Design a protein with these regions (language model features):
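Flexible, glycine-rich beta-alpha linker
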Residues: 23-40
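Short-chain dehydrogenase/reductase
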Residues: 1-8, 35-42, 64-65, 96
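C-terminal substrate-binding subdomain of Rossmann-fold SDR/epimerase-dehydratase oxidoreductases
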Residues: 48-166
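Active-site Tyr-X1-5-Lys
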Residues: 1-23, 49
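Helical cap/lid subdomains and adjacent loops of hydrolase enzymes that gate the active-site channel
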Residues: 23, 44-46, 122
Length: 166
């Protein structure tokens, strides 16, 4: 996050001093088919598909997941805009959800899985609430995330069932 903040400041300075054309997009927790299998959602999906116990935190963290097709749509809208130089725009669902709820939704859709909540401690300094204000994306791009977390989970689970057998 320090690197992202530094890059943002650098780009904003370039825009202000040199009129360097830049739009800063901040995608929040993108997920979907083909995502690196070491990431959170693929790990949960694989854990549930296996039907075996798997350890997780208590899941109280609040996050803002955004399906990859929606992120891509937001990026394309920003690229086609002529008057957004210097803007910082969050691309997110705007629907905060707990990690525990996401895990339960995956488990319910798959029909099996045995998460052991509270077995993994939170990371030191973990941000317990991380979600986006999407009002600038709506106002400046006319963009909103279209895919619900339920639909996104289903599409992602279906991908892993078909293309990433255990």
């Amino acid at each position: 996050s320090i690197a992202k903040t530094s890059a943002t400041h650098c780009l904003q300075t370039l825009y202000r001093t040199e009129r360097f054309p830049v739009i800063i997009l901040r995608p929040f927790l993108s997920y979907g088919p083909g995502q690196d299998s070491s990431r959170f959602l693929p790990q949960i999906i694989k854990g549930c598909l296996s039907g075996k116990e798997f350890e997780t935190s208590s899941g109280e963290q609040i996050r803002d997941f955004c399906y990859i097709d929606d992120i891509t749509d937001g990026i394309l809208k920003a690229m086609k805009s002529d008057n957004l130089n210097g803007e910082i725009i969050n691309l997110a669902s705007g629907d905060p959800i707990s990690i525990r709820t996401v895990i339960e939704k995956v488990k319910t859709y798959i029909g099996k899985g045995n998460p052991k909540f509270g077995k993994i401690p939170y990371r030191v300094g973990e941000n317990m609430s991380l979600y986006a204000d999407t009002s600038r994306a709506e106002r400046l791009l006319g963009w909103r995330s279209k895919t619900t977390i339920d639909d996104g989970i289903k599409k992602t689970v279906d991908y892993y069932r078909a293309y990433d057998p255990q």
